[in-house]
């Protein structure tokens, strides 16, 4: 009996690696889409935090400009610009992750039709 189970296992493995037996890809694509959506949400949260940080730096810069301390004002302005650049980068990463999730959902739909 063990010999037959082993042979059956080998046959299933061989046919699976040759592509004759398709594993259920739908669940895999759905999991990947969920992971990409979670990643996008993480990037969007980071972008929100960086935007808030940039706003704080801008306020500080304005305060120093009112006090005629232009070196400090320039420093805070540079930090604000840097934070905004990072936020834009995070948003582009989030968009890429959302696009990948959407593609995985499309693949999952196609896999269900087969």
Placement of each model-derived feature along the sequence:
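Extended amphipathic alpha-helical heptad-repeat regions
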Residues: 21-114
């Amino acid at each position: 009996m063990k010999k037959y189970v082993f042979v059956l296992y080998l046959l299933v493995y061989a046919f699976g690696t040759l592509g004759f037996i398709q594993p259920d890809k739908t669940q895999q694509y759905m999991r990947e889409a969920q992971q990409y959506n979670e990643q996008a949400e993480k990037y969007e949260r980071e972008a929100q935090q960086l935007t808030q940080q940039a706003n704080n730096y801008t306020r500080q810069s304005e305060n120093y400009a009112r006090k005629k301390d232009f070196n400090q004002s320039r420093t805070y302005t540079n930090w604000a610009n840097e934070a905004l650049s990072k936020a834009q980068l995070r948003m582009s990463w989030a968009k890429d992750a959302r696009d990948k999730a959407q593609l995985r959902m499309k693949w999952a739909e196609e896999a269900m039709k087969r």
